[in-house]
Design a protein with these regions (language model features):
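Zymogen propeptides
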Residues: 1-219
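Low-complexity, polar/charged sequence tracts that form flexible coils or short amphipathic helices
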Residues: 102, 212, 232, 256-258
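Short alpha-helix capping/helix-loop boundary micro-motifs
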Residues: 218-232
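Loop/turn positions that initiate beta-strands
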Residues: 233-240
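Short, Lys/Arg- and Gly-enriched loop/turn segments at beta-strand edges
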Residues: 244-257
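Short peripheral tails and domain-boundary helices/loops at the edges of structured domains
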Residues: 255-281
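Periplasmic peptidoglycan-binding/anchoring modules of Gram-negative envelope and division proteins
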Residues: 284-285
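C-terminal soluble interaction/assembly domains
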Residues: 289-290
């Protein structure tokens, strides 16, 4: 279009100790929330909300994962709020172009570190659980899917809100199987953090699912070899895990406090990137502020 467009820049002085930037998502994973509503919900006498912008993408009901797999409303890729993992990083929308620079510009994650410094980079997932001297990857977080993969360990935390983990019966009905599973409910010894060793105590074990999760707790679920691995723990045992996220092209592992993913990296040092025209979706205009 040849019409004039106006761009307004909202500037925040993060050297002021009273100013912060926080990621925000609905109180129940899979539910969506307008930014103006989140603004009001998070505003209080000691926590004033002064601006917001919608910057992530979530799975919609017309996509296969949303339509068939109980993932409608769940973010397409990673989220972190105040050091607490919301959802794991995925390969969503990766692979536009073969050149190194093309790939580096696929997805733009906005990350705020513990020094309140902003970064826009691609990030990769590297989470692990250790029981004794054995370890296994944590493949997903808070993706309460009805079609879980075999031979994996997945995690859920209180960002599930009012929703319980899906029951074994629901999963078996969706997949047409009778596959054993196990869930460990664990209590964290410290606050959530990214790229740091976290410890937790196993407080209960079930094989049916349907677990609701309070703040300070997490559920570890396994099927196949994931089930066999989790079965090595018993109530009262101490387990260790690390929610690993690293900058995809340097390997750096910053102290991530906030993280959210837009669709693509559209501008770098004042210049438009190739992602403005190598995917049609990015030519459209979407107002995102609140």
């Amino acid at each position: 279009s040849s019409s004039t467009r106006h761009c307004y820049i909202y500037e925040v002085d993060l050297t002021n100790p009273y100013n912060t930037v926080e990621e925000s998502h609905s109180t129940t994973m899979g539910n969506t929330e307008r930014m103006v509503d989140a603004h009001a919900r998070l505003d209080s006498a000691n926590h004033r909300s002064i601006g917001s912008v919608n910057c992530n993408f979530w799975i919609v009901s017309t996509q296969d994962d949303g339509k068939y797999n109980n993932l409608t409303g769940v973010p397409c890729t990673g989220q972190v709020r105040n050091g607490k993992i919301g959802t794991n990083i995925t390969n969503w929308n990766i692979g536009h172009g073969e050149a190194w620079l093309d790939r580096k510009q696929d997805i733009g994650y906005l990350m705020i570190d513990d020094q309140k410094k902003a970064h826009i980079d691609q990030y990769s997932w590297d989470a692990h659980l250790a029981i004794g001297d054995q370890a296994m990857p944590i493949n997903e977080v808070n993706r309460n899917r009805s079609n879980p993969a075999d031979n994996e360990v997945v995690m859920f935390n209180s960002d599930m809100g009012t929703k319980a983990t899906l029951t074994k019966d629901v999963i078996d009905a969706r997949l047409g199987t009778n596959q054993p599973m196990i869930e460990l409910l664990v209590k964290l010894e410290q606050d959530w953090a990214i790229n740091q060793h976290l410890f937790a105590e196993v407080v209960s074990i079930n094989t049916t699912g349907g677990t609701k999760i309070e703040d300070g707790y997490a559920v570890l679920r396994g099927r196949g070899t994931g089930k066999e691995f989790l079965e090595t723990a018993k109530v009262g045992d101490r387990v260790q895990f690390i929610i690993g996220m690293y900058e995809s092209y340097t390997g750096a592992r910053p102290n991530i406090k906030q993280l959210s993913a837009g669709n693509c990296y559209v501008m770098n040092e004042g210049k438009l990137t190739i992602r403005n025209w190598n995917e049609d979706y990015n030519n459209k205009n979407y107002p995102r502020t609140g």
